[in-house]
């Protein structure tokens, strides 16, 4: 029997606000444990939360960018459960009236071809929990409350995703939208973007969904892909063995490529939601929403379309450049300097991405002057330096943020522009390679390429290849 996979994702993103959602504590990542904590986010009796207005703005911005309807009258609710990383024993979230509803993101339909819409059921604001630390002590678990109260958006999709590849593309597109809107850095390795993956399978032709399981807090694209494929296969094997899939929460172990049952899957009634009594409802005016709408940046899909029509870039080029807002900023500044969008794109997709990959650096963590790449391209295209030298200059810019012109001068990388000097070197090379010269004159075309290579080596790559070729042909006749 053949089966269809059905997936829905709950994507959690930490917002790039300076302070937490209900207090003034810092949201900075990586501080000393429990150094960004106050009475409010620690849940001390008698404290009262106050909503961070920037969180509301970012939620509306995200909703508009994902085609959602903004709920003019929305409110917070309490989600009640006990866990050591939740000091109040409840989480302030939104259940009944979330701030954004009924949106969508378009992705590639991997099953039927073309494109499809993954519907977004809702986007709601909530506070993050703390973090349990298990690996520093052998006899106890520690709790770091720095993350407690950091503002989150939870983006809940409908079960419209039919395979692992679609799930990854959906999260990639969400990440790009969030980054372009400036609401989150989406650094998955720091936990600022993570996904809860809901998976079920159903026989082809069936009309009812199968029993779903959930795998929580998956924080890489590879893990999302592998978790979905593994869980779908596990459920198929359970069904074909004559058993029933259990509705449960499972933990994905990416290192082992498998998941483990944690607990039975909870429903909303298990959390005993009720309206948050310490926070008033939020009422948003049409003017407020329209102001945010007008301030939206050019979003990834619109930017891709413009790059293709205005610059003649390919689908592949635009997908790569628009995969990170950092690439986009570098690309647009480089085009502004060089006036050459195709060279700018190829340098970013080639040398810049190679340097990032080799150094295991994220695009968001690039620290060199964005004007430098444009200047390097100008130097190479103006025959001031060779392609190989340009790569070396970029590597120095990447690691040490050097000035390209100063680096070229200090390392004597300037191209030889004196045709007389080039001719002298070519003549010397020909005198040293009489056999190759005679073979070329005897009709062996490959010897010409050999001689060019010898000339470029003698010139240490510091002469334009076209000029060397021209002089070589003139001498050989």
What residue ranges belong to the model's regions?
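Residue-level detector of well-ordered alpha-helical segments, enriched
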Residues: 317, 330, 340-348, 372, ...
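Basic, nucleic-acid-interacting segments
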Residues: 1-298, 315, 336-340, 354
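Amphipathic alpha-helical core segments of compact helical bundles
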Residues: 16, 198, 233, 349-357, ...
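Structural motif
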Residues: 1, 312, 335-344, 382-385, ...
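C-terminal non-catalytic interaction appendages of large macromolecular assemblies
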Residues: 145-150, 188-195, 204-207, 414-477
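M16/insulysin-pitrilysin zinc metalloprotease superfamily fold
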Residues: 337-338, 344, 352-366, 375-380, ...
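Strongly charged, low-complexity linkers/loops
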Residues: 364-374, 378, 384-457
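Core structural elements
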Residues: 191-203, 271, 308-330, 341-358, ...
């Amino acid at each position: 029997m053949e089966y269809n996979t059905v997936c829905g994702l709950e994507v959690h993103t930490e917002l790039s606000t300076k302070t937490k959602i209900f207090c003034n504590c810092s949201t900075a990542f990586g501080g000393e444990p429990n150094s960004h904590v106050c009475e409010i986010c620690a849940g001390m009796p008698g404290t009262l939360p106050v909503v961070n207005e920037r969180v509301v703005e970012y939620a509306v911005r995200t909703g508009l960018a994902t085609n959602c309807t903004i709920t003019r009258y929305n409110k917070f609710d309490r989600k009640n459960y006990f866990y050591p990383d939740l000091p109040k024993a409840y989480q302030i979230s939104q259940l009944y009236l979330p701030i954004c509803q009924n949106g969508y993101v378009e992705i590639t339909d991997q099953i039927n071809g073309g494109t499809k819409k993954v519907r977004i059921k809702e986007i709601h604001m909530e506070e993050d929990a703390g973090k349990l630390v298990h690996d520093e002590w052998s006899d106890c678990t520690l709790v770091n409350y720095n993350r407690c109260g950091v503002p989150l958006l939870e983006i809940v999709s409908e079960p419209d995703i039919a395979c692992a590849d679609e799930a990854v593309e959906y999260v990639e597109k969400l990440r790009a939208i969030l980054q372009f809107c400036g609401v989150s850095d989406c650094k998955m390795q720091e936990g600022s973007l993570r996904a809860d993956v809901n998976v079920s399978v159903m026989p082809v032709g069936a009309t009812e969904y199968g029993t779903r399981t959930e795998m929580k807090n998956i924080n890489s694209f590879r893990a999302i892909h592998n978790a979905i494929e593994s869980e779908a296969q596990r459920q198929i094997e359970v069904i074909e063995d004559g058993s029933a899939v259990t509705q449960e929460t499972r933990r994905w172990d990416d290192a082992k490529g498998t998941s483990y049952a944690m607990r039975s899957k909870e429903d909303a009634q298990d959390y005993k939601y009720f309206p948050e009594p310490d926070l008033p409802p939020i009422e948003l005016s049409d003017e407020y929403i329209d102001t945010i709408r007008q301030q939206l940046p050019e979003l990834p899909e619109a930017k891709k379309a413009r790059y293709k029509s205005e610059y003649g870039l390919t689908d592949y080029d635009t997908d790569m450049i628009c995969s990170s807002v950092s690439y986009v900023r570098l690309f647009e500044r480089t085009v502004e300097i060089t006036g050459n969008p195709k060279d700018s794109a190829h340098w970013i997709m080639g040398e810049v991405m190679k340097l990032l990959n080799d150094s295991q650096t994220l695009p968001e963590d690039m620290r060199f002057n964005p004007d430098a790449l444009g200047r390097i391209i100008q130097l190479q295209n103006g025959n001031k330096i060779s392609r190989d030298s340009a790569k070396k200059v970029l590597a120095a810019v990447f690691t040490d943020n050097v000035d390209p012109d100063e680096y070229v001068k200090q390392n004597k990388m300037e191209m030889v522009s004196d045709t007389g000097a080039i001719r002298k070197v070519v003549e010397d090379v020909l005198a040293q390679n009489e056999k190759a010269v005679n073979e070329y004159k005897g009709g062996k075309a490959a010897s010409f390429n050999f001689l060019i290579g010898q000339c470029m080596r003698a010139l240490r790559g510091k002469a334009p290849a076209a000029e060397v070729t021209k002089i070589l042909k003139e001498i050989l006749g």
